[in-house]
Amino acid sequence: MTAFAPVWAVGLMTGTVLDGNVDIALIRTDGETVQAFGPWTLAPYPAGIRPLLQLALDAARAWAFEGPEPPVFAEAEAALTRAQSAAVQAFLASAPAATLGITPSVIGFHGQTVLHRAPTAGQHGATRQLGDGALMASLLGIPVVHDFRSADVRAGGQGAPLSACYHAALLRGAAPGTAVLNLGGVGNLTWMGPDGAGPGGMGPGRAGPGRAGPEQVSPDTALIAFDTGPANAPVNDWVEQHTGGAMDRDGALASAGRVDEARLARLLRHPYFTAPPPKSLDRFGFTAAMADGLSLQDGAATLTAFAAAAVGRALDVLPHRPARLAVCGGGRRNPALMDALRCRTGAEILPAEDLGWRGDAIEAECFAFLAVRTLRGLPISFPGTTGVPAAVVGGVLNTPNPAARPKEGFAN
């Protein structure tokens, strides 16, 4: 493979929990390893963006990939793209990025997932992220890679999770027996076997043809990733419905409640948890309605325990159960969830920072990393991560067109 000099890349990520922010991170990478970690930030959206995105999410659920897209998609996509473009411009113009004189070669723009449908035996998968890569490239004058998931879905994959490729690069420096658990709206797990070469041109291995049983994957698979189940989304929605708050801050409500173990056992009988990976979920695949009839505190406790127990079930299907989980994403800041993971997985639970990683920046770093892989023509999804039949080079590259720069600039 021709040598590729590492470049600076910006990654942008907004999660399905709609916290009103965009994560922005800079890394220097060749798409296989990370040479340097640059600055990162959490940039709040202007007023009005979050409610508009919520309208788009609500419209997406009613649309369900049937018929024309809801009109609110175009409005929300333009507003989100301009808001994130303005955030990137401010980020690059401020210290330390400006002080270091960093000029990115590419931006990885994930956009906002409004609907995701995993493929089933009788139905093709589908996915929709709001984000206009061509508009962002024109506004910033920097190449932009967006629409990372569609190519995988068209090829028969789940379209998620895509973070495995980057997690594998991070795991190269971790102790054996470590897996990565990301806790956003949905949880996802990345496991790399002892023969995993990491994300080179074809590093993560092809899924083995045989399995020991319907609940286990082949031990010769080098890289496995899948969604474990719900994470923060149901409990966040539960708290918002009952208090107007955005989340169970510090797990205070869950800590004050009692888990309904009988209900939890019923929830864990859902067929998703016995299906072999690769598999993926939409943010609304499991909802706060699972706790209906419980008190505020008991509902929070039960939904939190469900998220942790789902991870425990996920570990059961791996070829080798990991000794420890490096946890990234917002869920690692919830002490009740972290304690529940320790209780219900049997693994050592460590925040990503204990491994020297930046837990709040990992998802944004991931899309910077994937953007560089797209530039190089390297795959970003694999049979063991999304179930796609063969590795797929995903993402759409948009090059700047100064003549097409909108006169209104960053204004909505």
Model-found features: residue ranges?
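Nucleotide/phosphate-binding catalytic cleft detector across ATP-hydrolyzing
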Residues: 1-4, 114-127, 133-134, 145-146, ...
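Extreme N-terminal starter segment of soluble prokaryotic enzymes
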Residues: 4-10
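Glycine-rich phosphate-binding loop plus the immediately following alpha-helix
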Residues: 14-16, 21-27, 39-55, 139-170, ...
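Glycine-rich phosphate-binding/hydrolytic loop that grips phosphoryl groups
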Residues: 18, 353-403
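Short beta-strand-loop/turn "lid" adjacent to the catalytic site in phosphate-handling enzymes
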Residues: 63-131
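Intrinsically disordered, low-complexity terminal tails and inter-domain linkers enriched
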Residues: 96-103, 193-221, 407
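Short glycine-rich phosphate-binding loop at a beta-alpha junction
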Residues: 101-110, 320-331
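A contiguous, well-structured pocket-lining segment that forms one wall/lid of small-molecule binding clefts
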Residues: 242-322, 335-342
